[in-house]
């Protein structure tokens, strides 16, 4: 039998209907729902007199629009209406909901894994582009639009053209202070925001195998910023250990049977990809974005580039515009860029390991004068654990604001807006113009780099800093 990639195995396992020249109809194992992209979908069902086909394969939470302070008092009318609509829709259609009073509430791509809803071999969709996060478990996870949300609610299926396969193999060992966030920023920085266009990426190699599940989630989360339809990692013992005992994961003998099935999903030896990229881990350093898309980045040792450094006129024009928006001069060392805001959070970097890494930098120090720093845990469970471990107190003692869970300052859709013209060191995934608020200037970094920027008031090389034990 011809060796297959995990991508081919999961895809073929889920094809319900196929016709030459048309997209495949895929069965969907898990549909995650939030308050922003679902109201019109539910309204569509209502108007057509349809039910949700599989409420038991659907799970909802509220994350994008929720305040992270006084969360039950929602002043914005649009946000208030969206949250009320989700509560009403979940009641009417019998969908499980982790609402603002629930201990299970959080960012949808944080709670799916921590509750054990996310499992190897599943097809997973959500009306959010960073659904690719769940691919870290060896799942095929896509972001979908509102009309597709309605289609999945009604039929538990999705029409999809089968993408090509791209292997990104990261060999060797990462240097001290280099994180999963730096790896994915380096990939996008070197190969561009369209390297994955038309592909599903499988991340392989020694570096990926040595990563925790939370680090793999960071990598897969930003597959979308590389242009891919999805990104994933073949499941292994690290995956199974993470899932064991989680609320919605199989239990006892059923779990052992599931592990047998999950093991068989891994890409076969000799399987062929449409394209392969190899990266030497030792060439990756802590990264900082300087521009207005995630490929506009350099290492902490670098400088803001000159437009003339780029070969094409189109690139030069884009760089000029980005530098103007960001208020940066070519040739400026990255370490001399001042920051006025720091945001540690988002579906990319708001898990317990992210907060531990940031706390190691922060412990015993103070936030620099003129810097406002937020730490927003990705879920209420992460918040509780961080408080129990003493991490929250480390941040509070240093002058950080410690918040409830939500998407927060990742996107300018809730009260946590970055003011116009001010620079934010952010652990999120997008640095587009206006992403964190009108005129906000976003620099994407790892949690450790963001924490260091908060303490020093500008970017610093975390490899040169003393880290304190935190637990």
Swiss-Prot record:
Its EC number is 4.2.1.33. One of its GO terms (molecular function) is metal ion binding. One of its GO terms (biological process) is L-leucine biosynthetic process. InterPro entries: 3-IsopropMal_deHydase_lsu (IPR004430), Acnase/IPM_dHydase_lsu_aba_1/3 (IPR015931), Acoase/IPM_deHydtase_lsu_aba (IPR001030), Aconitase_4Fe-4S_BS (IPR018136), Aconitase_4Fe-4S_dom (IPR036008), IPM_dehydratase_rel_enz (IPR050067), IPMI_cat (IPR033941). It comes from the Bacteria. Pfam families: Aconitase. Catalyzes the isomerization between 2-isopropylmalate and 3-isopropylmalate, via the formation of 2-isopropylmaleate. Belongs to the aconitase/IPM isomerase family. LeuC type 1 subfamily. NCBIfam families: leuC (TIGR00170), PRK05478.1 (NF004016), PRK12466.1 (NF009116). Heterodimer of LeuC and LeuD. This is 3-isopropylmalate dehydratase large subunit. The lineage of its organism: Bacteria, Bacillati, Bacillota, Bacilli, Bacillales.
